[in-house]
Design a protein with these regions (language model features):
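Cys/His/Pro-rich metal-binding microdomains
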Residues: 20, 24, 283-286, 311-312
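Conserved AdoMet/S-adenosylmethionine-binding subsite of the radical SAM
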Residues: 82-245, 250-253
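N-terminal, helix-rich and Lys/Arg-enriched segments in bacterial and organellar proteins
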Residues: 29-37, 128, 137, 154, ...
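Auxiliary Fe-S-binding modules of radical SAM enzymes
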Residues: 1-11, 35-38, 56, 61, ...
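N-terminal [4Fe-4S]-dependent radical SAM core
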Residues: 1-101, 278
Length: 312
């Protein structure tokens, strides 16, 4: 569990890493190469992991505990960018006491065709157990959402957000009817103008995220100001929030940046354990207040009785 540098979430959680999409602009593939060690040697340590065949017949790796390097340090991506289920990471969610917006699978496509339903269901189970957080999922395979929904396996909780990543206006994305599932659209990197987008939909997505391609690729696409303006107009026409990533500052300027969130993602909740630690019922009025907003008055009816808590 890591604090995130991704502007639209608080933390990233990566119980699954690796992806088979093969996108040429993928930042995650480049990053894993720096923290994988010698993948060939890692695969020789067969006692440290297990494998299974994925739904698409690809080889998948499973780690029930971290694999260590020769120096005793955990290898974050011991199999490079090959799909890996880090089952030992499933309990890290419980270490967060305050409610957070958590991006699940920043270094993978959790809903790729190669990912077994069992892996996804295990992740959902953990998320459901810790409902003080908002969980944001992203995929380039939105059809998997539909398959899971039709099978009754896609949680409909209000704190689950299902996003689709697209880069061009002709790509498919998951569209859920209002009142069913929370969903959003991530247009990153934006590679073409979405200018006609607003004229072809009956309403905008509940949330739009947009960002430019980063890195030093000689073929990097630099979006035009009008491309971003058109998306903002679409969002504003339908009264929907839009979030611009910092990669757009050179394109639109800081004063034109929009960093809107859906209302729910701005609300923070806390775990039951932290609730009991920080809050207490006033002994006089019965209201539940933060302890640091209350004062203990030495008002005792007789010697030996505890002081009562009153609002400050």
């Amino acid at each position: 569990m890591n604090k995130s540098k991704i502007e639209w979430c608080d933390h990233t959680w990566n119980p699954i890493t690796g992806c088979n999409h093969g996108c040429h602009y993928c930042y995650a593939r480049t990053m894993t190469a720096r923290f994988s060690g010698d993948v060939r040697l890692n695969k020789m340590c067969k006692a440290d992991y297990s494998t299974q065949t994925g739904p698409d017949e690809s080889t998948l790796y499973i780690l029930d505990k971290p694999m260590l390097s020769e120096t005793g340090h955990p290898l974050v991506y011991p199999f490079g960018f090959e799909p890996t289920f880090h089952r030992y990471r499933m309990d890290t969610i419980g270490k967060l006491k305050m409610g957070n917006n958590i991006f699940v699978g920043a270094m993978a496509d959790v809903f790729g065709e190669w990912v077994p339903d069992q892996w996804i269901e295990e992740i959902f189970t953990v998320c459901l157990e810790h409902d003080e957080h908002n969980y944001l999922f992203l995929t380039k395979n939105p059809e998997r959402y539909m398959k899971l929904a039709n099978a009754g396996k896609l949680p409909q909780q209000n704190n689950f957000w299902y996003g689709t990543t697209v880069t061009r206006p002709d790509q498919e994305y998951a569209w859920f009817e209002s009142g069913t599932y929370n969903w959003f659209l991530s247009i990153e990197p934006i590679l073409e103008d979405f200018g006609k987008f607003g004229a072809t939909v009956k309403t905008a997505p509940p949330w739009i995220i947009v960002g430019a391609q980063t890195g030093r690729s000689k073929n990097k696409v630099i979006p035009e100001f009008e491309w971003i303006k058109n998306l903002v107009l679409t969002a504003d026409t339908f009264g929907k929030p839009i979030f611009m990533k910092d990669s757009l500052i050179p394109i639109v300027g800081e004063k034109n940046m929009r960093r809107d969130f859906p209302k729910q993602l701005l609300e923070k909740t806390i775990s039951e354990k932290m609730q009991n630690k920080l809050y207490e019922a006033c002994s006089e009025c019965g209201k539940v207040l933060r302890k640091n907003q209350m004062v203990a008055l030495m008002a005792r009816s007789k010697r030996g009785t505890p002081a009562k808590q009153y609002p400050s």
